Amino acid sequence: MATPRGLGALLLLLLLPTSGQEKPTEGPRNTCLGSNNMYDIFNLNDKALCFTKCRQSGSDSCNVENLQRYWLNYEAHLMKEGLTQKVNTPFLKALVQNLSTNTAEDFYFSLEPSQVPRQVMKDEDKPPDRVRLPKSLFRSLPGNRSVVRLAVTILDIGPGTLFKGPRLGLGDGSGVLNNRLVGLSVGQMHVTKLAEPLEIVFSHQRPPPNMTLTCVFWDVTKGTTGDWSSEGCSTEVRPEGTVCCCDHLTFFALLLRPTLDQSTVHILTRISQAGCGVSMIFLAFTIILYAFLRLSRERFKSEDAPKIHVALGGSLFLLNLAFLVNVGSGSKGSDAACWARGAVFHYFLLCAFTWMGLEAFHLYLLAVRVFNTYFGHYFLKLSLVGWGLPALMVIGTGSANSYGLYTIRDRENRTSLELCWFREGTTMYALYITVHGYFLITFLFGMVVLALVVWKIFTLSRATAVKERGKNRKKVLTLLGLSSLVGVTWGLAIFTPLGLSTVYIFALFNSLQGVFICCWFTILYLPSQSTTVSSSTARLDQAHSASQE
């Protein structure tokens, strides 16, 4: 399954445990599902067993939210003790010790995954995995404390579902590098906006081609279980590893995610721009042709099917136009202008998805339901849905300030393309729900209807079929036309692996969707009734239009 972010990007180149719970008096305890704040050896071993199971397989018995919060809060529990502590388990290594705030030197700690973190002196050889805490961090702490508690934690989250979040549950090869989290905490305080950032060095081998490394932290405020965010962190790739510079303290990791190099982005952008330009020409021809037919043929004033086709073509025309303006403008203009371009592009993208769904709904009435298909003011109601529903979604998304500058970077973290979309650092739930989730619903509905319609077409009796000689060719043309109307090619972004060939096919086919629609419209409506390719579909259109009168 391809990355949900891949749909937007390709188109644009295109455990706070609850307290007060009573123990059940009967039945066995299920600590994997339960939540508590007990850190004695008995409860700790229970949680460790659950954590191990979830790390390995992501069992249904896992309460991911509770387990994640449990281990995040375990660090805070260690901070409450007064003595230096070391924790050494197969998946958790932790060091807690007192540090003087009146220091003249930065503090260094090793982060070797197989060892408990330890303080490293300035004159020692620096370990490949390490963290540097600037002295200014301790001097800026509130309360004029002379001594503070510092906790350094290394957590192996394994390949399961823990600490994955929506950004990594995409099946596109993304993941936490070496399944390792590094936690930093000082004095049980929420430390943010450091004047001098801390530095974490992750050593690793050279990443695979078309993969990039990004420094992130676990943001517990995102959603119900938290998610990864890169806000406040910068990424610098060095020969010895990747350096993360962040202006706050929390749990950090290095994400490995698919990316596109500059040459690929450039080629895809040119393909998309050329395809969109050609598509706009054909879509404009479709709209003009419909206007001509509406003036010259009386039946086009009452038929709903041509109106729906033209509405879809209009939404795609405006979507292509918004895309060309967006790519051409890049980061130019004010933040408000970028917000507007992102909102307009999002709106017409949702309009295109909606009209594809309405095309499928109309096909359902024509070929599947057939009888009792009368709806008063049918096209008006479809228009309210096709143009109004996306507007409501964009208003809701825009009110959360989700639009802004979006940057596509290559594996060296160089900017490949800038445009206005969902801004970086914002919650991605709006993107997942209003773009990928919404498209998935309309796409699956369209596929079900298309399958039913194709089955009907290919099982027509010989009495109503056209001549045997050209039957198969005409059926194939009908299938291709219907596929264009319901947006079959968009499924490449959801149901196929995000390989380079898929990227090119997606960019080409979707930018040329307008060409397919124009050819379908011309073949279906321009010739006389006797030479129409899909006579069965035309008769269905006429029958449905008659029922609306």
Swiss-Prot record:
- Membrane topology designation: Multi-pass membrane protein
Q: Which residues bind cortisol?
A: 510
Source organism superkingdom: Eukaryota
The GAIN-B domain covers which part of the protein?
107-262
Q: CDD domains in the record, alphabetically?
A: 7tmB2_GPR97
Q: Name one GO cellular component term.
A: membrane
Residue ranges, annotated region (GPS):
215-262
Post-translational modifications: Autoproteolytically processed at the GPS region of the GAIN-B domain; this cleavage modulates receptor activity. O- and N-glycosylated.
Which terms in the Gene Ontology molecular function aspect does this entry carry?
G protein-coupled receptor activity
* Primary localisation category: membrane
Conditions for induction: Under inflammatory conditions.
Q: Which InterPro entries match?
A: GAIN_B, GAIN_dom_sf, GPCR_2-like_7TM, GPCR_2_secretin-like, GPR1/GPR3/GPR5, GPS
- Kindly provide the name given to this protein in its UniProt entry: Adhesion G protein-coupled receptor G3
The organism that produces this protein has a lineage beginning with: Eukaryota, Metazoa, Chordata, Craniata, Vertebrata
- The gene that this protein is the product of is ADGRG3
